[in-house]
Structures are given as C-alpha cells and as structure tokens.
C-alpha cells in the first residue's frame, strides 16, 4: 500500500458502493433563493425505496457516482452536492413520486442552457434503479436568469416593429410543406399575406432540398413579402427557416435574410440544439431580426406522462436560450394540449413573475426579473370556428397560425386569409364590447359571415371538423 493510500485510509476513507440516502436525502434542508430547484416524477424499480431513488437522482445529476471515491475528500461536497429535500406520492398513481431536488448555483455555467440540461437531465434518466423519470418543472433563480439575454427582442419590441397592437397576430404555414418550387412557394406566400395575414411560415422540415434550395426560397419569399406589404400598407413577414446542418451554414442563411431586409427568420431549436439556438438568437438581437422558434421533436421528449421532460421545462429553456415566438399547441386543434397545463406554460413564456400553481402544473414560483417574453404560437388543425376559443384562451399576445385552415379554403389562399382575418377582427371587437367568446363564439362567427362571403365559405367547409381525443398529458 502506498503512503498516500495509507494516509487516506487513516483519515476515514472507506471504499464500497454508496447508500445515496446517507448523503443526498436531506429532508431538513431549507432551500436558498440561489438554488436551482427541480421537480422529478419518479417511478422506482420494485423494492427501491422512494427516498433512495430521490437521493440517487440528486446524486447522479450533481456530484455523485455509484461508489465512494477518495477524491471526494478534496472538495466540499456539502457546498456542491444536489439535495433531495422532499418527496411526495403522486395522487392516483401507483409507485410514482414527485422528488424535489435543490442544486447549488455554482454547479452551472452562466448563460448556458446546454450545460444546465447536461447536468440535470444528461445522465440520470438511464439509471437502473428507476423504471421511469420525468422532469416536471425547474425553478430558475433570479441570479441565474440574469446571466441569460433571453429572446432577441421580446413581445413589446416586436409589436413596435410591426406597428400592430390590440389583437393576436395571424399566421399560416405554407402547404404542401415539401415539393413546391421556390417560385410557386413565393406565390403562395404572397396570396396569404395580401389576404390579411401578418405572417407566413416555412414548415419545420423545409431547409434546402433539391426541389427548393434555400437561397432561391429566400429570394422569392422576400419579393412576395414586399409586394404584399406595398399593396396592403401593413408590415408583413415570413418565417424563413435558417436551420442547417452546421452552425456556420445556419449563420450564413441568417446573414442573407438580413441582407434581403426581411423582418424575421426561424429555427428548429430542439433538433438544432441549444448552443446553435443561443448563437442565432444573439445574431438576431444584434441585427434587428425577429426569431421564430419551432419545437420539432418535442413530443419525443415530453409526451409520455411518466418519462422525459415536460414541455414547460423546454419552454423555460427556450426563453433563456432565446426566441421571440414558440409553438405551444392549441388546446382546441389536432395536437396534444390540456387547457390548464397549456395556459401554465404560456404564462411562463410571457409573464415576468409567475406564482406557483399546481392546478396548472407550475411547481415553483418563477421570477424572470424582466427577461423579455416570448409570444406563444397556436397551430395545428385549427380553422375559423376555433377563432373565438383561441382568442379567449391565448389573448392578444399570441400568434394564431392556420395552415390548412387558410390554404384549404375552397376559393384559394387569399380568400382563406381574408376569412381568418375577418373572423379574428370580429372576435376581438366582440370581446372588447364585453361579449362572452366562450358562450357566444359561434354566433359571433355567423354574424360576421353574413357580410363576408369568404368567411361564409370557410364556415361551410369546416363546420363538421373536430379533433375530439382525450389528452394524454393531464395533471
């Protein structure tokens, strides 16, 4: 035995497998304002006590490993370790628990969502002692939130850029999402924008394919945008997807969009990655571009109720990483979204201070200390009959995005856009007059359709369309 080993052994070092509870389960711990707090939904393996499982989560996502190591004595574990400070059973679920874990702020690099996620969810989700694990919520302390620049511009600056106030913004995803030539794509954009929409959008998987290279698309779309803008007198935009295979190529596309003078670009932030997203957000801030964020791949991560990461966490991560819009689901359309849960993370995106509210899935009070807000985008299977509900649910600070609900109009793209704009204006006026959109919504749409043949035709086409499936992700 070497002298160093003898010295360490004499100081009390004892090799062996760790009992995590002895070090990482601390029910008497009082959380600090600077702690990053996490709420995990755990499903331990049979025979594993919840206290041991919660302690293992805290250990494996902070300083711990499976065995005792002599280098533990070279640092202060009490200063740097994560702590499981509370465990509660999930009502109505067998062998599921919410484990609350506190992490010291010094564990995380300033301004890096990538490092935050690598630490908290990077390894522990494959831990054998757990059958399943889901990160339900994070509390980002004000001291850490201040290290992020957040959205490039935020809600108020976007409204000022667009000179549009007092109503939700209207958008449309161009369809078919793949296969159009750049010139025909630009034509579809023009028809939608001249009909009354504020934005049109590249679908998330439109980047630079053989049928439509990115530079051609950018050129034709810019021409369409400026033509519609000149005809209507309104500022228009199209979300040009800058997502690419490398960060260098992505930044080149963003720079070209800036040279063309368009107001907004787009990024697929989960498939592109947080590092790329933050870099693009910084570029947009410095160069006056709005940044639309698509959440492609989110359901792979967030849809299962007992394993993965809840979208409210991904939404918080996006607000820190940077984006002016993000898709959030609709509550009423074809995509997953329970009302109270959706409204919870919509508030986390828009508001400065959000109180803890378990009825909406918010586990911690969140103070963003004036980090700019993000506009929620409602899209997926919505049409004119949904307009009253969408206006009532999402309010003015939102983007209501109709793809098939615009392009599927029997008279074409421009009449489809007219129908949506008329429906929106009618709902906003009715709301401002004190009418109840939830109860009188259909009547409001019918009244507006009497003087808008485009809206009347849309109402007839989609009168029977519903997506009535039970949501998977409930409280």
Swiss-Prot record:
Query: Which taxonomic lineage is given here?
Result: Eukaryota, Viridiplantae, Streptophyta, Zygnematophyceae, Zygnematophycidae
Propeptide residues, chain positions: 1-2
Residue list for modification N6,N6,N6-trimethyllysine: 14
Q: What is this protein called?
A: Ribulose bisphosphate carboxylase large chain
Q: What is its main location?
A: plastid
Q: Does Transcription regulation appear among the keywords?
A: no
Q: Which HAMAP family would you find in this protein's record?
A: RuBisCO_L_type1
Q: Which reaction does it catalyse?
A: 2 (2R)-3-phosphoglycerate + 2 H(+) = D-ribulose 1,5-bisphosphate + CO2 + H2O; D-ribulose 1,5-bisphosphate + O2 = 2-phosphoglycolate + (2R)-3-phosphoglycerate + 2 H(+)
Q: Which GO terms describe its molecular function?
A: magnesium ion binding; monooxygenase activity; ribulose-bisphosphate carboxylase activity
The note describing how and how many cofactors are bound reads: Binds 1 Mg(2+) ion per subunit.
Tell me how this protein assembles: Heterohexadecamer of 8 large chains and 8 small chains; disulfide-linked. The disulfide link is formed within the large subunit homodimers.
> What function does the entry list?
RuBisCO catalyzes two reactions: the carboxylation of D-ribulose 1,5-bisphosphate, the primary event in carbon dioxide fixation, as well as the oxidative fragmentation of the pentose substrate in the photorespiration process. Both reactions occur simultaneously and in competition at the same active site.
Q: Which gene encodes it?
A: rbcL
């Amino acid at each position: 035995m070497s002298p160093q080993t003898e010295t360490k052994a004499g100081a009390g070092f004892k090799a062996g497998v760790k009992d995590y509870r002895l070090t990482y389960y601390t029910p008497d711990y009082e959380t600090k304002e600077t702690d990053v707090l996490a709420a995990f939904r755990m499903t331990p393996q049979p025979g594993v006590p919840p206290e041991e499982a919660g302690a293992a989560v805290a250990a494996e996502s902070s300083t711990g490993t499976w065995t005792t190591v002599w280098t533990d004595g070279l640092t202060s574990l009490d200063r740097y370790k994560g702590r499981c400070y509370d465990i509660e059973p999930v009502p109505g679920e067998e062998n599921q628990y919410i484990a609350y874990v506190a992490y010291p702020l010094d564990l995380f690099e300033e301004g890096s969502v990538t490092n935050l996620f690598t630490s908290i969810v990077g390894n522990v989700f494959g831990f054998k002692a757990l059958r399943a694990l889901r990160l339900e919520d994070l509390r980002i302390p004000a001291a850490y939130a201040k290290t992020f620049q957040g959205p490039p511009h935020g809600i108020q600056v976007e409204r000022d850029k667009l000179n549009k106030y007092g109503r939700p913004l209207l958008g449309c995803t161009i369809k078919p999402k793949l296969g159009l030539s750049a010139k025909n794509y630009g034509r579809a954009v023009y028809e939608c924008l001249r009909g009354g929409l504020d934005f049109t959008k590249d679908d998330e998987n439109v980047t630079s394919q053989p049928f439509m290279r990115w530079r051609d698309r950018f050129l034709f779309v810019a021409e369409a945008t400026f033509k519609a803008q000149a005809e209507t007198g309104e500022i228009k935009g199209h979300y040009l997807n800058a997502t690419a295979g490398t960060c260098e190529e992505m930044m080149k596309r963003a720079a070209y969009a800036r040279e063309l003078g368009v107001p907004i670009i787009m990024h697929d932030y989960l498939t592109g990655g947080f590092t790329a997203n933050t870099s693009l957000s910084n570029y947009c801030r410095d160069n006056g571009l709005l940044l639309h964020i698509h959440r492609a791949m989110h359901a792979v991560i967030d849809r299962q109720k007992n394993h993965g990461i809840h979208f409210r966490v991904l939404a918080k991560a996006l607000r820190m990483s940077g984006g002016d819009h993000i898709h959030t689901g609709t509550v009423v359309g074809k995509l997953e979204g329970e009302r109270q849960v959706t409204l919870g993370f919509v508030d986390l995106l828009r508001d400065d201070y959000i109180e803890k509210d378990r009825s909406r899935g918010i586990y911690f009070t969140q103070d963003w200390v004036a980090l700019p807000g993000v506009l929620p985008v409602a899209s997926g299977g919505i049409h004119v009959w949904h307009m009253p509900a969408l206006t009532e649910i999402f309010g003015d600070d939102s983007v209501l995005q109709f793809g098939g609900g615009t392009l599927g109009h029997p008279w074409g793209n421009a009449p489809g856009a007219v129908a949506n704009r008329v429906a929106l204006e009618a709902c906003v006026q009715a709301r401002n007059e004190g009418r109840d959109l939830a109860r009188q919504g259909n009547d409001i749409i019918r009244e507006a359709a009497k003087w808008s043949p485009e809206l009347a035709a849309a109402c007839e086409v989609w009168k029977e369309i519903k997506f009535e499936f039970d949501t998977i992700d409930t409280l």
